[in-house]
Amino acid sequence: MANRGARHARTEDTENTINYVQCDGLAVMKMVKHCHEESSNMDLAQGALLGLVVDKCLEITNCFPFPKSGDETMDDETYQLTVMRHLRRVNVDHLHVGWYQSSDVGNSLSLALLESQYHYQTSIEESVVVVYDTQKSSRGFLCLKAYRLTPQAIQMYKDSDFTPEAFRTLKVGYESLFAEIPIVIKNSPLTNIMMSELNELLPEDKGHNFLDLGTASVLENHMRSLIERVDELYQESVRYNKYQQVVFKQDTEKHRALAKLAAENAVRTSKGEPTVPEEEVIKQFRPMPVPARLTATITSGQINTHAQHIAQFCSQSLAKLFITEALQNAKETKEIK
């Protein structure tokens, strides 16, 4: 889990003090390289973010990957402390300001992400989680987003109360679990000059595939993931409906038993006998534990994210399709003439 190595020293409450995240180009390239290397092995890439807070800006100046979970020869916390100690010796920012992880098929919201960010944010108040979408970035759209847990989500997780009543009281939904923080990438002037020169050296037939309609695999992956999430949400709904049916049946039996007891007590009273207290009947019906709704909330958020990505992707593909059709018709008309 990404909460490995999170420090346990609380600082002052700094909620809503991080207005934006500034990430150096070097840190971005290291994150991108690590995430793409792990995506080839179908693994989830995770790592630590290093930097500092300046005014209301969180500056990320460096990062390093976490060791793989299957590596039993390396202690995670010792590894992180050793890396930060070496960085400090060479005068590199070594303050732990968050963590990053890769995301596939454009969906990063999960129970593990929520739990890890909770541990980070309650021990390092200014920490953020940076999510890099490998699939979308491989199509030419750099997708790098920073998130923080909202105060309501932190309070709910702190109370460990994920019942429907808690969600209503705190007004928490899948759209209010995380707050997205604007992220900007900063490069040195020399880096910008080099990138401009590289752009001029790029062949004309490369890097301008704006009308590429490669929709099959992307749309298929999104649809498959959407169907899986809908099935999971259906199973959660079935479990909750069964709970409601059991509660309704129990309440009916309890009211029937109380009515019977009231009739018996009326007979006892008429005979001058002591009545039986209602608590004797109520004790026979133990309250059913309310199922947690956190998993269903996260699944709903995943469904919403997939639906948004599908709608956005389809609108872009349709626009490309109509443009391509117009160009093809113009080409055929020109050939006829």
Swiss-Prot record:
Q: Where is the MPN domain?
A: 21-153
* Localization (cell): Cytoplasm
Please name the SMART domains in this protein's record: JAB_MPN
CC per GO annotation: eukaryotic 43S preinitiation complex; eukaryotic 48S preinitiation complex; eukaryotic translation initiation factor 3 complex
GO-annotated biological processes: formation of cytoplasmic translation initiation complex; positive regulation of Notch signaling pathway
Q: Name one GO molecular function term.
A: metallopeptidase activity
In terms of Pfam families, this protein maps to: eIF3h_C, JAB
Main subcellular localisation: cytoplasm
Q: Which UniProt keywords apply?
A: Cytoplasm, Initiation factor, Protein biosynthesis
Q: Which CDD domains match?
A: MPN_eIF3h
Presence of the UniProt keyword Protein biosynthesis in the record: yes
Which proteins does it associate with, and in what oligomeric form?
Component of the eukaryotic translation initiation factor 3 (eIF-3) complex. The eIF-3 complex interacts with pix. Interacts with mxt.
Biological role stated in the UniProt entry: Component of the eukaryotic translation initiation factor 3 (eIF-3) complex, which is involved in protein synthesis of a specialized repertoire of mRNAs and, together with other initiation factors, stimulates binding of mRNA and methionyl-tRNAi to the 40S ribosome. The eIF-3 complex specifically targets and initiates translation of a subset of mRNAs involved in cell proliferation.
Give the similarity note: Belongs to the eIF-3 subunit H family.
- For this entry, the protein name equals Eukaryotic translation initiation factor 3 subunit H
Annotated organism of origin: Drosophila grimshawi
Q: Which gene encodes it?
A: eIF-3p40
